[in-house]
């Protein structure tokens, strides 16, 4: 009990957050500095940010719109999920000077289940597109697919290169604003093309999500069609709202971390 009381006292003056890329460690950040950093990132109250715009609608109105859209796709939103995500940041201690990673997330959110299911669907489409290019590479010896789900393929490629002993140099690049600078319409158009390509490949015209996986099916009940998947993608990207305290913002370019 005494330890818990001491932690609560610390929280009066400090924000306790995990450290980026060091999840077992925590940082104690001055609460005033933490809030000022968030306001500066959002450029509030000046409203000069190209990425985040102040939304004049209240949170309840936006949540109701999210619930209505999800219901149109067959989702029933739990009361505990009828909220908007919030913005926070964690320090990048591996950077000099110390950097900041801004994150918009929440344990509960009105579009949480839809977003999770769309993510599972795109993992299915990813494997389909990857298999297509694997076959193309087999026949043409020309690789057009440069997307990886994790570091395993990269490590395997490095290992094969090391065995050949013919590598001259290796370079890595880090895009600090890779996700937050993608124009929404460009992203929506590219994903729509991937959806069109994937749905044209087989006879099954619906995708169902069950548990952790998505699969192709002939059954349209509780499934995504090509059109409803496009609608879901468009909505999740273009209607992304979050809060800082009781202030509502809309992300107008890029996607959240």
Predicted regions, residues:
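Generic preference for well-ordered alpha-helical elements
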Residues: 1, 19, 32, 56, ...
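Conserved polymerase palm-domain catalytic core
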Residues: 157, 161-257
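Non-catalytic, polymerase-adjacent accessory regions of viral genome-replication enzymes
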Residues: 1-89, 95-100, 109
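Eukaryotic basic, amphipathic alpha-helical target segments in cytosolic regions
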Residues: 11, 46, 71-73, 98, ...
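Conserved pre-motif C helix in the palm subdomain of viral-like polymerases
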Residues: 84-131, 176-188, 227-243, 249-257
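Generic structural signal of hydrophobic/aromatic residues within well-ordered alpha-helices
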Residues: 3-7, 35-42, 58-59, 63-73, ...
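Active-site-proximal segment of RNA-dependent polymerases
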Residues: 113-172, 177-180, 211
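Internal, charge-rich low-complexity segments
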Residues: 29, 34-36, 40, 124-138, ...
